[in-house]
Amino acid sequence: MTNDTVHADAVVTEEDLRLLRDLKVKDRLHDLEVAYCRGIDRRDPELLKSIFFDDAFVRLGDMKEGGVDEWVDWIINEFKPRFENTTHYLLNEWYKVDVKTAEGETHRLSYHRFGDPARELIAASRTFNRYEERDGVWRIAFREVIRDWIHERPVDQELFTGGFAMELSKPGPEDKSYEVLSMFGRGPLPSE
């Protein structure tokens, strides 16, 4: 008999177990990436820090590079305050897993509203990430971001009234999601 596990009529092979483990890891990496989007848009420094290891390095082209604490402080206190609102969307995700390390390329579309009169900046970027599992926890160990394209235009204020009127999202703890979704509080991701 091999190392395969038999369940009734089914045989689970070592390859099946590896694929299942890789799927679980990829799901965890996806959670890190969507938590990044929420942390950026809700301006939640603890959530942002929790997706990275303490010794991780982040590089945003010529904008900023450095350790996680320095980067989070800059993004929350210097970069984001110039925008009334931001929304980040996670698009394509591609991960390669090798036991306790992984690499991933993720594509993002981001929206930034700012200024008087109001303008909107829409940009596409890609992130190149190295992930690691340490003590059973997956986090980002390295991230580099590059820009694919960027576009700026005036905001059509009429679209925020009449038949299109809805409550606008807010960048911090006043966002409606904290009122409606009790499981989505501020702060770090829970450990696995």
Question: What is each stretch, according to the model?
Answer:
Residues R153-E192:
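Acidic/histidine-enriched, glycine/proline-rich intrinsically disordered or flexible terminal extensions
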